[in-house]
Amino acid sequence: MNIVITGCSQGIGAELVKLWSTNHRVFGISRNREKLEMLKLSLENHENFSFISESINDLNQDSLTEFLGQIKVDVLVNNAGLLINKPFLEIQYEDYKRVMDVNFWGAFHLSKLLLDRLSKAKGQILNISSMGGVNGTSKFPGLSVYSSSKGALTILTECLYEELKEYNVRVNALALGAVQTEMLDQAFPGYKADTSPKQMAEFIDSIVVKGS
């Protein structure tokens, strides 16, 4: 399989790279080049992992062709995420734009850019969402922008699930609860989640690769 994954320099994304690079070709898109290089060096089959350290929203067809060549894409995992924990009255437009650019627009943009490659492979898109972005679930103070961005991603997933059937592309979202990632620790110092990034990566593998 050829798998493209965003937000893979740490956390769940990095664990997925470790897992999938054993038997698949993995193409990572993330901004932290230093962490990506360290991740590649740590892999047993490091030749199976290629990366580009660039903002998703700056990518275009030319830069993707330079990165991916002419390969088909079997799986796209839109995993990149940004969490800001800030009271509603303190939120500025810049906060909103940063979060929406990463959590929503990045997934929208990359899914569109890769649609032809995914269609040729009869592939799948997995959007990593959050329970905070699901209607009717518990919501928490300070997460108005984050939860709203994940809600937008969830609705986008539902729309694309229907719209991309004619392209033979399956689209799903996984709404995560708390996972003990660096992002969670930065937003909620001292909070301990029950699920590790490795455990979540193994679960994602079970539905994306083993379940495909």
Where does each model-flagged region fall?
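Substrate-binding pocket helix/loop in short-chain dehydrogenase/reductase
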Residues: 87-88, 95-97
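Conserved NAD(P)H cofactor-binding loop of Rossmann-fold oxidoreductase domains
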Residues: 79-85
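Catalytic loop of short-chain dehydrogenase/reductase
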Residues: 124-152, 157-158, 162-165
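Rossmann-fold cofactor-recognition segment
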Residues: 43-59
